[in-house]
Amino acid sequence: MSKSEIASNPLEFPDPMRFADEIEQIKKIKFNMDKERIVFTGSSSIRMWKDISAYYPEHQIINTGFGGSEMSNLLYHLEHMVLKFAPAKVFIYEGDNDIDAGRPIPLIMEQTEKVVEAIESKFPDCQIILISVKPSLARWHLRSSYGKLNHELEVFASKNANRKYANVWAVMLNDRGVVNPSLFIKDGLHMNKAGYDIWDRVIRPIVES
C-alpha cells in the first residue's frame, strides 16, 4: 500500500503512523535465526497476550501485535511485523477493529489478500493462519458483520494448502450461543487468562503441527 493511497482515502485507510512508538519497540525484538520462528501479529488481542511464549516454550514465538490496528495497518507495516523474521508460521488477528470502524468487508478482504500474498510471495513455504474475529461483550451488537467476515476469511484460507483458518469464535460462546462473559476483563473487549486458555485450545494443534 502506498502513502498516496492512504492520503487519498483517509476513511478507508486509518493513519498507519499512529503506531510509530509501537513499531520502534517491535524493531528491537531479538530473535534467533537458527531456530524456527512463529510470528503472532495483529491487533490488541495479540498484543495483550503477554505470556504467549509461556504457552509454547518449545517454540520461538515472536509477538508483534499492535493495539488498535486494522488489516491495512498490518499491510503497511508488514516488513517490520512479519517479513523481517522469515517465519515458518504466521498467525494473523485483524478485522475486529476494522468492522468496528465501519470498514466494508470487501475492503477488509482486499487488504487481507494483499497481506497474505505478500508473505507467500517471499516465503512460499510459510504457513499462514487467519484467526477468526472473536466475539466480545463490548461488540456483540456487531456479531452479524463479524460472522460474515469470518466466513470470508475461512473461504479465503481454504484456497491454499499452506493457509489455515483458526476458529476462536465458536469456542468462546456458551451453551446458549452467547459470548461467555467470564473470558474478558472489565472493558468487555479484551480477554483475561481464561480467554487466552480458550484460544490455546484452537491454536496449539496448529503450532505443534
Where are these regions (language model features)?
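N-terminal secretory targeting modules
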Residues: 1-40, 50, 54-55
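Acidic/histidine-rich helix-loop elements
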Residues: 7-14, 61-71, 100, 188
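Conserved beta-strand scaffold positions in the cores of enzyme catalytic domains, especially
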Residues: 40, 61-63, 165
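Oxyanion-hole/transition-state-stabilizing segment in secreted/luminal serine hydrolases
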Residues: 46-55, 60, 71-109, 129, ...
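Charged helix-capping and loop-helix junction motifs
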Residues: 105-115, 145-150
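A short helix->loop->beta-strand "cap" motif at the edges of active sites that frequently abuts
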Residues: 123-127
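Catalytic His-Asp segment of secreted/periplasmic serine-dependent ester chemistry enzymes
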Residues: 137-209
